[in-house]
Amino acid sequence: MRAKKSLARPKKTVIFSNDFYSDMRADGMLYALIVRSPFSAGKINSIQLENQEPIPENYEIFTADDIPNQKFITTFGTRTEIFCTGEIKYKGEPVALIAGPDRKTVFELREKVKIILERKNQNQEESQDFFEERNFEKLPEQTESKKTSELKEPQETSEQKNSENLEETAAEREVLSGDAQSEFKNPENKIIEGIWKNSVTQHEIKETAGCFCCLKGENLHIFTAGRYITHIKDSVSRATGLEKSNIILNCTKKNNQNSNKIWMSSIFAAMASVAALKTGKPVLLSLEREDEINFVERATFVKVKNRAAVSKDGTIKAMDIEIQADTGYKNPLATEMLDRFTIAAAGIYSTENLRIRTKIFSSANPPSSVRLNRIDSQVFFALESQIQKISEETGFTPLEIRLKNLRNSNAKSKISKNPFELELGRAEDSMKAVCARSDFNRKYAVYKLAEKGRYETDENSPYSPPLRGIGMAAAFDGNGYLGTNFKNENFSLQVTMTDERKIVVNTAPPSQNIKEIWQKIIIDSLGIDKRSIQFNLDLSLAEASEKGIAAIQNDLMIGNISIKTHLLKKCLEAIKRKKDAVLPITVKKSIAPSKRNQWKEETFSGTPFFSTSFGTCVVEVEYDSCAFSEQVTGVFAVIDCGRIANPQAAETAAKQAIKKCLSTLVFGDSLKCQKIVVQFAQSDDEPKNLDSLIYSILPPAFCSATSQALALTVNELPLKTDSLFKIKENSEKNKKIKNQETQ
């Protein structure tokens, strides 16, 4: 498609289209690529081609010096440089943009780029070819801390060892409830400890991040899949000096949005805009797949230490939970992660004595990313895995230990002995239902007995039967976090009745099931025809941008379905009251302050979510002791997510989420399962989140099942293809050492 087809004079500075930005073409267009630092530290002296050869005609290298105004963007108070301004902060930091009319030549020129560092001593090399380390090995999940951080699993590179910009605490929070220490000192309590690590991510890359920029008269047109509209326009305006009214934002077909894309889209737009203004030519900046994975979709490494005091009757008397997460260099969403991790750590249990310490580290790594609607899944993995370990060491079944510690599980009751008040819905009924459907109790007992006699000499025979395991997990999913940074757009809704008596709702349903529910609500309320209902996200975002509101596409937000359904009903009630008024009628409703005030940010307590959904699942696995591989033989899930208008569509969506989640659990492999069973708890509550629950309950259930099959603890995800072999190998080595010590 040609870009100029979309460049008709717009009435507004925000336009929406169904195109991909990467398909845009224009006469004289330049292809742009980002030049990244191969160093993790050092001060840049200059950037040039090898042998100091001149750059060819019609090709350009742009650095921070070419930005006419502000050289950084600001996201929630965090400054991020568009290009490195001198001192390198992390390996892979953007230092320049190289652009030219031929994409192949641009790639070749980038290979010749040399970054000259200031010499600090005689032994330090002056420069290094960028492509000498261009094929980045998997970036280390974290680096060693100057302080007492324990996030140092991978080995440091030589550059990281010399770096002065090592790990520092970016944000921390501590939540105390009761007196945990006294319970740990009680000799009658059993102390059970576990360490759990998770860096699972999902690369659903349809179109890589980037943008297309071109000038038309006094206006700069930006085509991007980014949806943080006001942030993009503000960042480009501050960098280029253009008035916001001269920046025409064309929102193309959106790709999968993680937390990094929300703010990195503004950086890419600023880079391409500077190049377009300097050259006067259209510029297409599109990230390579490798860059997308390493720098935009980079997983957040989370480590959780859980120490529990359990009484003889299986009651969890106290928990001491320490969460550590490396979010890379100055992550703008570190505070959002901090809060959600802390809330998730309390889980669905009524532990009276609780201590949660959460630390977010800023390190000399690229900023890590999370899916906003799955932001707490890594902490649920740790908590549910710990519950499974408590079950194994106390002798209670996983269902018994959960029901014994699940407080006040009636439909509308709340957890009272906990700093966070959460509605759990039909949690107890759901867990009993999933265990009955999967025959969990019987299989768990059989597999538990089968652990005896493991690791005989003939175990690795190709004729030996597979080893089996079964695990379960449960979690809540918060719908509409009341402490989020994205409050303005997430907590309001506008509905218009046009002069033709059509209803226009300024939001987009995130699924067909939700769309059908909203349509039925409108029809029942106003009695209009289904064909007269229109969902128009574009208007609300464009209008918000014009008014300077923090407009961001609402389906990126954490669990806004319940909020939007609630506000839709309020808008329709207001329109009914104005039925005799002159058309058109526009009504805008927001969440009542009393509801927002249920969450007390100053004390970090109260009701953190507008509503919560609940899910539980059981996973069965078979372990081939000869091939050291696992196979998922069954997944059973029961979900309480409010009213379901189309059960078949909801079931299909849940099964698709399960399949996608399974594909993330083993690095370099994609687990599959033929037997997937999904049930929904009957409810008249407003609809709530569905697919994000799967990512909180499936991984810990899989890990618990694999641990039982292996008869060894699996405490880290994602697995690698040789992980189970190494776990067993290390176990056998430890056994030999113990046997030698006892002899």
Please report, for each region that a protein language model flagged, where it lies by residue:
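Cofactor-binding beta-sheet edge motifs in enzyme active sites
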Residues: 1-150, 156-429, 446-743
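Short, basic alpha-helical nucleic acid-contact segments in DNA-binding proteins
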Residues: 437-438
